Amino acid sequence: MLTLHDIIYLEPRRHRSPSLYQEMGWHYRRLIVPRILKKCRKIITVSRFECERISKALQIPADRITAIYNGYSTHFSPLPEVDMHIVQQYIPEKGFLFFLGNTDPKKNTERVLKAYSLYLQRSATKRPLLIADLKEEYIDRVLQQEGIADIKRHLYYPGYIPNSHLATLYNASFAFLYPSLRESFGIPLLEAMACGTPVVTGNTSAMPEVAGSGALTVDPSKPEEIADRLLQLEQNPTLYQEQKAYGPQRAQQFSWAQTAGELSKVYQSIKI
């Protein structure tokens, strides 16, 4: 039995990861996983999308693969009041745009920053963007590469943000950006929806499967679409309130208790 969260490392890629840790992990999994899979009687993964990818890429019969969704921690929920002491450790005021950054190309950081520059050109509000988990050197390189260095004054990039502060920041933000190029599931997507934060996410891979109607989807390869969605949320109060309501409703369909129950059934079904 093997739990396999994704097979991204077996798919073609355009760029090497700038992180040595990520690059070594990519090569290790690419070498080891196909060998292990040959001996597995059952494979568990985290979405129907990933089931199909595994079956197709590795020529494994679909009935040997089971999709069991992830859950999320229950402290992610709408808060009656936002703790501004936590918020102001990262950004002066609430009502910002929030993005969990990463140097992994699939996280689409370059296009998110390009989309944000397009948003700033058209928005009357010009909300600042809080970026987690990225160093200034990397951000500067992307801004120079995209020719948008002038937007830096609107960015906040405190580096690492502990998990214990994320629920407060989701609640304090105007919208959460999660337009990845590829996700096998996407737990941050659930976390933000559970907090009642409107989400802009990708229309590819497992993201629409997880989001349902609880998030707005875009083609993540098109920065102008990402910017358009942000502006729609800003300019259409009805749409904004609908998304705030849809998110928690959708997130309630996922839980770690449900995940554990389904895992238990699969393990019990295997005869030794």
Stretch-by-stretch model annotation:
Residues M1-I272:
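Carbohydrate transferase catalytic cores enriched for Leloir-type hexosyltransferases
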